[in-house]
Design a protein with these regions (language model features):
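Short amphipathic alpha-helix that is part of the acyltransferase structural core
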Residues: 13-89
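Cationic, low-complexity basic patches in intrinsically disordered or flexible, solvent-exposed regions
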Residues: 4
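Conserved acyl-donor/pantetheine-binding loop and adjacent beta-alpha core of acyl/acetyltransferases
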Residues: 78-117, 132-135, 154-182, 188, ...
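Hydrophobic adenine-recognition pocket in adenosine-nucleotide-binding enzymes
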Residues: 25, 118-120
């Protein structure tokens, strides 16, 4: 795979210089990915993707599955499919969009990159790793000439305010920086807009009370006249993007 190296300075969680890489997911990454996901979703009972599910997703759309590594260890990922958004519109659930994890909803001729997963191991948060995953997803959207990125976003702090605020009021307060929501605040800072509040998107997500934000990022380079056939002929590999992170410590 082609390699690009860009040297960055930011926080590191150890004394050594850290090498951060973004690349496509392979099945060889499964055990490390499972461990990171269980840590990331400890508050949801340590949920994780089954190996056969990830295998099916990679077979459907290998270019849309991205991992980030810290000194060679897989510590996060961003998973996506392509959909024809008009078929789903603004009212759908997570199971609707994933075809109950069959991913039969993936449409290579679709116009929208739909983000179905993104997480970073909690021990590696604060290193801007999630931002790099999002940037890689945006780059993929641009290279594939897709109209936009759509995702259903959790609002994990909403449960703390649910007795006093409606989901809309909560989102407005997060947008106005009166409340810090670790997921929504980050997404808004990465140029995503809240298009709608979706109820019962993930009913088992008690922290969000089953709600999700329908998030959208528009590809300003989208060309509606570009041939889908030409898009299919393009080589759209994330490749290997590497950063060297020098440690930064606060007393």
């Amino acid at each position: 795979l082609p390699q690009q190296v860009d040297h960055k300075t930011c926080k590191s969680n150890n004394m050594d210089t850290a090498i951060i890489e973004v690349r496509n997911l392979t099945l060889d990454d499964y055990n490390a990915l499972k461990e990171s996901m269980q840590k990331a979703y400890a508050s949801l009972g340590g949920q994780y993707w089954k190996e056969e599910t990830l295998k099916r997703l990679i077979q459907k759309f290998p270019d849309g599955q991205i991992v980030i590594t810290h000194n060679g260890d897989v510590v996060g990922c961003a998973l996506s499919i392509i959909v024809d958004y008009d078929k789903f519109g603004d009212k759908h659930t997570y199971l609707d969009i994933t075809g109950n994890f069959s991913f039969d909803t993936h449409d290579p001729d679709g116009d929208t990159l739909y983000g179905i997963e993104v997480f970073v191991h909690p021990d590696y948060r604060g290193l801007r790793l999630a931002r790099r995953l999002y940037d890689s997803r945006k780059l993929l959207c641009e290279r594939m000439n897709l109209r936009m990125i759509i995702a259903g976003g959790r609002i994990p702090k909403y449960d703390m305010y649910a007795n006093e605020l409606t989901p809309r009021q909560y989102i407005d307060k997060v947008r106005n920086r009166e409340i810090l929501d670790p997921t929504l605040t980050f997404q808004l800072s990465n140029d995503f807009q809240v298009k709608k509040i979706m109820r019962n998107y993930l009913p088992e997500d008690n922290e969000s009370r089953g709600h999700a934000t329908l998030l959208v990022w528009h590809n300003v380079y989208y060309d509606s006249e570009k041939s889908i056939i030409l898009r299919k002929k393009d080589i759209i590999r994330i490749g290997l993007v590497q950063w060297q992170m020098r440690p930064y410590f606060k007393p």
